[in-house]
């Protein structure tokens, strides 16, 4: 059995990065969490086959070092959406529409698209999704016996966090790092408490509604000293400093990409509607010509009096064009 270096304090993990990996883990994408340093591997099948062979060999030979992040099943995805709708949406018509979407094909993407048309529900979803994802991740880490602390939960300076990573396997460190390690040990115990999986609701009157301002989390640099050479090209290192950057979508990697898709989809829909309207208008003009309401006829009899102004404008324009042609002939 392989012997690995022993970390001298709980692993510093990024919960937002874990949320991203958990949401993307599916039948085509594998993510692993390292037990030694806490880094995440994303087995990208688009990499060179030689690199893939090496990393698969590393995973096989050191299977006890890496934990495969579980896949989100169809049932779990549906359950997440249903729970949100039943617990957080109060308008009956809106709730019925959401539940109808949940039962449809491609429910995950349709759910998000409909959600972004309802700003109030969107904010509630963001909070719900982050809270439920956090609980799911903590439960999984506990089941796999990780001793950890989420870096986003700490109030340490960036310098101290980076020094803790640099000296993760050093028994003797400075007094400052010794104190920081003790704080990490105490903090790590909180994640194994009952409250970590069952957060207590805040008591008292809810605060007044105000403009929502989300502060980005300050995180330290990624410092890993024990990454096997075969795994280095597969490190999963997205810079996620805000929960609003996360997305529940299975097709898009970031919230920005999903929103860009929605905006693009809106423009495409407008273009299609405009094309349909243009085709119908052309059909009406052809029909009017067949019925005798051509350019010399009185189009107002066919289209109605509301088009009189437009026809007058056309009549005003046509003589001008004729006059121009007349002048050209005169010059010749």
From Swiss-Prot:
Region annotated Disordered, chain positions: 196-215, 291-332
Q: Where is the signal peptide?
A: none
List compositional bias (Acidic residues) regions by residue number.
Answer: 295-316
Output compositional bias ranges, type Basic residues: 320-332
Family assignment? Belongs to the UPF0158 family.
* Name of the protein described by the UniProt record: UPF0158 protein TC_0713
What organism, scientifically named, is this protein from? Chlamydia muridarum (strain MoPn / Nigg)
């Amino acid at each position: 059995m392989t012997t690995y270096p022993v970390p001298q304090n709980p692993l510093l993990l990024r919960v937002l990065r874990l949320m991203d990996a958990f949401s993307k883990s599916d039948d085509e994408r594998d993510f692993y969490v390292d037990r030694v340093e806490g880094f995440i591997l994303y087995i990208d099948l688009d990499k060179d086959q030689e690199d893939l062979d090496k990393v698969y060999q590393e995973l096989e030979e050191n299977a006890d070092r890496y934990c495969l992040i579980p896949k989100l099943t169809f049932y779990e995805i549906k359950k997440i959406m249903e729970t949100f709708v039943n617990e957080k949406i109060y308008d009956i018509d809106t709730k019925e529409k959401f539940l109808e979407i949940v039962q449809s094909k491609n429910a995950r993407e349709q759910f998000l698209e409909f959600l972004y048309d309802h700003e109030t529900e969107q904010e509630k979803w963001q909070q719900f999704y982050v809270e439920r994802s956090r609980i799911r991740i903590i439960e999984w880490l506990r089941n796999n016996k990780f001793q950890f602390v989420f870096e986003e939960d700490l109030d340490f300076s960036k310098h101290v966090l980076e020094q803790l990573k640099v000296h993760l396997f050093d028994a003797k460190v400075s007094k400052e790092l010794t104190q920081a390690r003790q704080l990490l040990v105490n903090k790590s115990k909180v994640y194994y408490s009952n409250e970590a999986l069952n957060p207590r609701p805040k008591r008292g009157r809810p605060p007044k509604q105000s403009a929502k301002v989300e502060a980005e989390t300050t995180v330290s640099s990624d410092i890993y000293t024990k990454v096997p050479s075969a795994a280095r090209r597969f490190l999963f290192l997205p810079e996620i400093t805000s929960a609003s950057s996360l997305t529940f979508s299975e097709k898009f990697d970031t919230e920005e990409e999903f929103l860009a898709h929605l905006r693009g989809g809106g423009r495409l829909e407008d273009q299609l509607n405009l094309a349909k309207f243009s085709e119908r208008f052309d059909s009406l003009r052809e029909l009017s010509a067949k019925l005798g309401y051509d350019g010399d006829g009185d189009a107002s009899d066919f289209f109605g009096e509301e088009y009189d102004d437009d026809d007058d404008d056309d009549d005003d324009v046509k003589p001008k064009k004729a006059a121009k042609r007349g002048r050209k002939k005169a010059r010749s």
